[in-house]
């Protein structure tokens, strides 16, 4: 389908440096390195304290593994979290802290990894997320995870979470700071490793796919880069025009990295949003 997303006014005349900067969250947030280091430290401690169901393989790749944090009840809802890094950076272990608030609130949590570009194409990455969900449906109960699944993800993981709403196992999604139209990414330096093809852009841009009539909350930080904010707003408007459920949630004062705290804290607005997605799914 034709994408309802359009590039910014004058995009064709932008320099390559300007296009790259439009999606460069690390440079766009002054203290990004400190925030990442803090998240990694918190995640290392959390993971060490919850080591019972880690490194569970769902595929043959080294990164194709789950870390599961089961609730006291196997039938508790499960929040799946998919990490970001523009499909080419980061690892699931450094996002373990994302389970803290949900686990305290009675959810189970699953954090899955996936093979990164350039080793994996976008097509392979999307397939790995679907394989991870298939594994969770088949084997999660053996690890105490058998409840309804809400898929969540941040940045590139927001893109993957939006696509993860399609499989039957998943009742809804929380997409945070995501990319929903891939075409502009192909015109930035991020594509040096992604090597996106026109067919992949068409097939794996959530905004071009048939609208999923499940609740998908779409969140972003109010202080994100303009293009990240716009991607979220356009995707939400596209879904709303198709009467698809799900809130648009700009998180006040949050940049691209600080927005994660709204999910990992038990009183966070995005953890509440995940609960609202679950309730809306019925």
Where are these regions (language model features)?
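Catalytic nucleophile-loop/oxyanion-hole region of alpha/beta-hydrolase
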Residues: 90-99, 110-148, 262-265
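N-terminal cap/lid segment of alpha/beta-hydrolase-fold proteins
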Residues: 18, 22-73
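Alpha/beta-hydrolase
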Residues: 82, 176, 251-254
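Alpha/beta-hydrolase active-site loop signature
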Residues: 86, 114-118, 180, 255
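The feature captures the conserved acid-bearing segment of alpha/beta-hydrolase catalytic domains
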Residues: 172-175, 187, 196-237
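Primarily recognizes the serine-hydrolase "nucleophile elbow" in alpha/beta-hydrolase
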Residues: 131-193, 201
């Amino acid at each position: 389908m034709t994408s309802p997303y359009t590039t910014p006014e004058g995009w064709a005349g932008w320099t390559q440096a300007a296009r790259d900067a439009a999606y460069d969250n690390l440079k766009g947030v002054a203290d990004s390195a400190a925030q990442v280091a803090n998240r990694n430290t918190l995640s290392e401690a959390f993971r060490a304290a919850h080591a019972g169901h880690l490194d569970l393989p769902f595929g043959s790749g080294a990164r194709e593994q789950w870390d599961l944090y089961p609730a006291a009840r196997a039938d508790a809802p499960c929040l799946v979290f998919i990490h970001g890094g523009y499909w080419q950076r980061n690892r699931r272990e450094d996002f373990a802290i994302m389970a803290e608030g949900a686990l305290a609130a009675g959810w189970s949590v699953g954090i899955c990894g996936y093979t990164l570009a350039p080793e994996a194409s976008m097509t392979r990455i999307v397939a790995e997320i679907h394989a991870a969900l298939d594994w969770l449906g088949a084997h999660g109960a053996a690890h105490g995870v058998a409840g309804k699944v809400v898929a969540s993800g941040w940045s590139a993981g927001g893109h993957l979470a939006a696509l993860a709403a399609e499989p039957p196992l998943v009742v809804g999604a929380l997409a945070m700071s995501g990319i929903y139209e891939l075409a502009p990414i192909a015109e930035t330096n991020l594509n040096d490793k992604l090597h996106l093809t026109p067919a992949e852009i068409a097939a794996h841009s959530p905004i071009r796919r048939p609208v999923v009539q499940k609740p998908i909350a779409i969140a972003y930080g109010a202080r994100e880069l303009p293009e990240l904010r716009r991607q979220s707003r356009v995707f939400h408007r596209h879904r709303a025009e198709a009467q698809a459920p799900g809130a648009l949630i700009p998180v006040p004062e949050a940049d691209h990295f600080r927005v994660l705290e709204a999910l990992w804290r038990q009183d966070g607005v995005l953890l509440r949003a995940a609960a609202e997605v679950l309730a809306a799914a019925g």
